[in-house]
């Protein structure tokens, strides 16, 4: 017997008060459910994105990494030499903490480099912003999901080498932060996009968010990534690819 029922019977026996009305548990559950579904989303402005982008560039650690990646990709833009591609993979693994090196039992550096080099017209397709390259890299040899790495590899080549903003980055910080800005979006949906390498759906979500907030600055995809990462990251927590 619940404490509420005890209290109701006690009052009835004393005659001091009318019995408490029974609580409609279904109504309570329904009201709670409505409250849970009602979630106020945050908004974005061009100024917010620009500010955090500049903060990233000014960061003594991450800003220098950003400039190093830009310099190396401009110097070695093509993806036809397995040895150079291997070096670029290692660069991304180090600067972005994609942790590919921790999964040598699933894929090794030489194999991943061969997969990238083996993609037909890779560089031209990056220049054109071809989204189909991302899932090819992400699925790699079929033993590991490299979705986050693939988005970063393509995004940085597009931005640094060709000066275009056609790609968007996925990582754990974005997955956790994005639902704060998109009504009805849940992390489980984003995780499904990652696990199935559905880059098209993921990018469409990002584009809809930017359009809904009238974000029209140059490199808006790249600056959104910097905004979300710099605002919501946990400095002590390394991102894991898996």
Please annotate each region the language model reported:
Residues 1-16, 20-91, 166-242:
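C-terminal accessory module of base-excision DNA glycosylases/AP lyases that mediates lesion recognition
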Residues 79-145:
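Helix-hairpin-helix/helix-loop-helix acidic hairpins
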Residues 134-180:
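Catalytic DNA-binding helix-loop module of base-excision-repair DNA glycosylases/AP lyases
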Residues 7-14, 93-99, 137-141, 153-158, ...:
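Generic structural signal for hydrophobic core residues of well-folded globular domains
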């Amino acid at each position: 017997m619940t404490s509420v029922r005890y209290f109701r019977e006690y009052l009835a026996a004393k005659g001091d008060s009318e019995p408490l009305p029974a609580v409609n548990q279904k109504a309570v559950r329904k009201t709670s459910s409505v409250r849970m579904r009602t979630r106020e989303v945050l908004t974005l402005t061009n100024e917010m994105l620009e500010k955090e982008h500049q903060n990233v560039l000014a960061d003594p650690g991450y800003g220098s990494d950003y400039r190093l990646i830009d310099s190396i990709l401009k110097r070695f833009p093509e993806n036809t030499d397995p040895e150079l591609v291997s070096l670029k993979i290692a660069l991304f693994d180090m600067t972005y903490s994609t942790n590919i090196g921790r999964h040598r039992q699933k894929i090794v550096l030489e194999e991943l480099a061969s997969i990238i080099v083996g993609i037909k017209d890779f560089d031209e397709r990056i220049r054109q912003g071809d989204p189909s390259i991302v899932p090819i890299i992400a699925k790699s040899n079929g033993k590991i999901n490299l979705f986050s790495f693939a988005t970063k590899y393509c995004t940085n080549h597009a931005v640094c080498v060709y000066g275009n903003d056609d790609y968007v980055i996925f990582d754990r910080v974005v997955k956790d932060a994005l639902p704060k800005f998109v009504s009805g979006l849940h992390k489980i949906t984003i995780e499904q996009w990652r696990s199935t390498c559905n880059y098209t759906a993921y990018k469409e979500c990002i584009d809809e968010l930017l359009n809904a907030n009238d974000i029209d600055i140059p490199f808006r995809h790249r600056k959104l990534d910097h905004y979300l990462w710099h605002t919501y990251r946990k400095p002590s927590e390394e991102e894991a690819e898996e």
